[in-house]
Amino acid sequence: MLIDSHAHLDSERYADDRAAMLGRAFEAGVGAVLAIGIGEQAAGMDGALGVCREFNGLAGMPRLYASAGIYPHNTHEADDAVLAKLDGLLGEPEVIACGEIGLDYYHEGAPREVQRAGLIKQLEIAAARKRPILIHCRGTNETTDAWDDLFEILDAHWRPSGLGGVMHCFGGG
């Protein structure tokens, strides 16, 4: 059995073909899919859970699981309400991981200090919910700036949890 560990199934670009796409995946031997719940904005991070609930249990479809998290460029939206929503989503049985979270210094987005603070808040929620993390980390060209910051944050705020995770986006050498 194959497992797709990172699929943005809630993206609108798949809306018209989502059921057929999942059916083709199942026919090709994909038995499970982790739908990444980041949405187009932080408030939409529940979209992957919605897809899971729509398709789970249907014949000829892979088993779907979801993650929930705030993408680095959306961390400026991580107010108390959004963080409470993340906490609630991580309590749902189908939501098995927190992500895609991390740091992205390559594209212009949320300021670096906002990304770092947002990541720390999400790590705290994931640890409290005992959910692994899915990390997205991308630095500027030819530098390790994002990676240096990420490892410092993980050492201080994630390692003590004893939980694991997956490095999804890698741009290092």
Locate the predicted segments by residue.
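Mid-domain alpha/beta scaffold segments of enzyme catalytic cores
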Residues: 1-173
